[in-house]
Amino acid sequence: LFRHVYTGVKANTKRALDAKDMSKLLSASLPRPLPQSMKESRAWITLMFLLRGMPFVDLAHLRKTDLQDSVISYRRHKTGALLTVEIPPAAMNLIKRYQNTDSASPYLLPILSGNRKSEEEYAEYQHALRKLNYDLKQLAVYCGIKLNVSSYVAKHHTISI
């Protein structure tokens, strides 16, 4: 009766970009200047890639205390596992450029404000993630990339190397 019903999981959605498209996304010079929000989103995806495919949730929740010299030690948001990542010079330059200057905020980067309760913080994170993914789709168009681009490309590209 159910012989022709497919019950498996379809896993053919390609999330990794090829090296050429990833290079365009991260560093290509563009025919017109990017809006500031897209520049920040480009910085976030570049950091995620350079920091071994760090998920956006972990990037957003990095604390100032997680950074020691050229090493970031943090707990993975999803699993609680402690991870230590050596920061390449290009990533350190981006961190210094975009580092959170609000002394009241515990966060390393100005993605989350740090002055909200957990429910509001989650909504703030969700908004930041949606904005990042929207900006990345626009950036892909700017760069002439035909594939769907989201915050997952940093992780999946790093895995595919």
Where are these regions (language model features)?
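Basic, Lys/Arg- and aromatic-enriched nucleic-acid-binding interface segment
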Residues: 2-56
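Conserved tyrosine-mediated DNA breakage-rejoining catalytic core shared by Y-recombinases
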Residues: 3-4, 61-97
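Short, contiguous acidic/charged loop-to-helix segments that flank catalytic cores in large enzymes
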Residues: 31-35, 73-86, 119-128, 146-153
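Active-site/catalytic core of tyrosine-dependent DNA strand-transfer enzymes
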Residues: 18-23, 88-146
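Active-site lining segments that contact anionic ligands and/or coordinate catalytic metals
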Residues: 20-22, 40-46, 69, 80-82, ...
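Short linear capping/connector segments at secondary-structure termini
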Residues: 2-7, 77, 110-117
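Short, basic (Lys/Arg/His-rich) helix/loop patches that form interaction surfaces
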Residues: 31-36, 133-161
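Short, basic/aromatic-rich helical patch in the C-terminal catalytic core of site-specific tyrosine
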Residues: 45-48, 52, 59, 151-161
